[in-house]
From Swiss-Prot:
GO molecular function, one term: structural constituent of ribosome
Function field: This protein is located at the 30S-50S ribosomal subunit interface and may play a role in the structure and function of the aminoacyl-tRNA binding site.
UniProt superkingdom: Bacteria
Keywords of this entry: Ribonucleoprotein, Ribosomal protein
One of the GO biological process terms: translation
Entries under Gene3D superfamilies matching the protein: 2.30.30.790
PANTHER family xrefs: LARGE RIBOSOMAL SUBUNIT PROTEIN BL19M, RIBOSOMAL PROTEIN L19
Protein name: Large ribosomal subunit protein bL19
């Protein structure tokens, strides 16, 4: 009984327009950022290296290489109100559920094949 109530409340806060994406896909995440009194959307594009959780607690980690070859990782909740949009840029073909090995690779070695 209490589990049904929890699921009903969670369903109310879940987004409906979340695209289907997997680990290895390159995604562009639009995050709402508040700077002083103004608000803007900041894009963060990179490879999904981890997905975990389910329902309202589902989250994913995106890794990209910033300037001067420094790797930047950000973890997002799929249904968070600050996450405005998630776009799949390209689909990757990987055989792992976690791509933490990409942390040790740079340049062409860190490329992921495209899924057809």
């Amino acid at each position: 009984m209490s589990q049904q109530i929890i699921e009903e409340i969670e369903r109310r806060y879940m987004k409906q327009d979340v695209p289907e994406f997997r680990v290895g896909d390159t995604v562009r995440v639009g995050v709402r950022v508040v700077e002083g009194n103004r608000e803007r959307v900041q894009e963060f594009e990179g490879v999904v290296i981890r997905k975990r959780g389910s329902g309202l607690n589902e989250n994913f980690t995106v890794r990209r290489i910033a300037s001067h070859g420094i790797g930047v990782e950000r973890t997002f909740l799929v249904h968070a109100p600050r996450v405005e949009s998630i776009q799949v840029v390209r689909r990757g073909k990987v055989r792992r559920a976690r791509l933490f090995y990409l942390r040790g690779l740079t340049g062409k070695a860190a490329r992921i094949k495209e899924r057809r």
